[in-house]
Structures are given as structure tokens and as C-alpha cells.
Amino acid sequence: GGGVVGDIGGLAAALYMRGIDCIQIPTTLLAQVDSSVGGKTAVDFAGVKNLIGAFRQPRYVFADPTFFATLPPREVRCGLGEIIKHGALSAELFDLLWAHRSRLADGELLAAVVPENIAFKAEVVRRAATEKGLRKCLNLGHTTAHAFDLTDGKLSHGEYVLAGIVFEAEFAKRYADGDAEYLAKLEELCLTALGGMPALPPAKDAARLARLDKKNASPDEVVLTVPVRKGEYRLLTLSYDEYAAGLEEIRNKFTAGGVQC
């Protein structure tokens, strides 16, 4: 199945008898490039994303691209969220996606980029099995994505990730000396995959939920993994007030540009 099935099954395998073997057979694009790889399984609890979970590597992962033919367009967009996130962390993958930005949902392209994505994430996980050090790069775009998701939950995970990358690219321009030309291209990739910025809930509500994110050291700050240059990221710590004000300003920027948020 998809990410939910993989998370529930993987967590059950990690807990039952203190851990039994698990085989992941992901059937969605998102699950193939992200959730089935890395051994991180979790469920939401008390209104917080992925609060209860475990790290346990699956025995095998079988990723078959023929499943893509069964997916509706929205499930493809969902998977593109994690694919473009990996592109923000890998210069080679970014160049591939940018060169083919007019056909991001093409089946042949997806079949070609899925192995690249799996290899990229597997290497990150090999070097940092838990959510410390290098593996923190995989949180890129996710703080804001999770905050919007918890606020209204009307979009898929990957759609929120695409929006989250756009917002956090804007934070990188403002607070992390991000390369404006590169970040504009990254935002264009995300918006192309989305078909435009979707309707999003009020920024003030999302900001309040972002301060509950487990990556934060205190409720008075928000920690983001932001893209700064091609293949480079940075951990950016903002005060809650900075984050809340920035989220509102960025949302207004897209609204003023004629894009509904």
C-alpha cells in the first residue's frame, strides 16, 4: 500500500515481540521514494505529527514502477513533493528535474527518477540512521508542511510538502542568505508540480502548530531545514514571532501575486 499502510505495518513490526522482520511493498509514488526507505515509522498522536514511532529497517523493499499506472493525478503530485525535496538536496537530481520540468508527471520520467531518489535517501539513511546529523536534511519543507496539514488536512502530504518548500525557500532568502536565482527555480518546480499554490489555512493558525513541532528546542522558537543553494541546506532557527510574521507575509505575497492561498 501507500505511506499510511507502510507506517502502520512498519510500526507494528517494530513493536510486536520487540521487533520482527517487515517487508515493504510500496504502491504509491510517495511511498516508493520516501516512506518505505529509511526505517522511520510513526503515527500522529494528540494533534502532533509522527509523535509515536520507531526506527526499524525493513528486511526488503520492493518498488515496482508499474504501480504508477494505477495512480490518480493527485497521488502523483503527492509523490512529487518528496522527489522535489530530494532535488533540493541533490544538485544532480535538481538539474534532472529542472531539465524536464514541463513533464514532471510523465511515467517514463518518474520511472527514471525513482531509483535516483531511493539511492539518495538510502545513502542519507546509511550515514545517519536516526533523526540526527545529516538525516535532518530530510526535514526540508516539512515544518511548514506539517503545520498547514494539521491546521486543515485538506491536501495530501506531498502537496503540503511542495507548499512548505516554497515557504521555506522564502525564509531562506530572508534569513539564510539563500541564492535567490536558484530558490526561484526551486519554487517554480514546486508550483509547476502543484499547478499553482493551493488554498491554505490562515498563517496564524499554522504558526501556532509549528511551535509544537518535535524538532524545536523550545516553544519560543521554530527550527526549519531550508534550501540555500543547489544541493545545500541549512538548519535555521527563528523566534516564534519571526516565523509567525514571516509565514503571514509569505502567504500574502502569493495572494497579492494572484495565487489563492
Summary of predicted features, one role per range:
Residues 1-6, 141:
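Catalytic-site beta-strand/loop segments enriched in glycine and acidic/polar residues
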Residues 5-6, 10, 145, 149:
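Short active-site segment of divalent metal-dependent hydrolases/proteases
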Residues 8-12, 169-170:
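Catalytic DNA-binding helix-loop module of base-excision-repair DNA glycosylases/AP lyases
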Residues 10-102:
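A glycine/threonine-rich phosphate-anchoring loop and its flanking beta-alpha core
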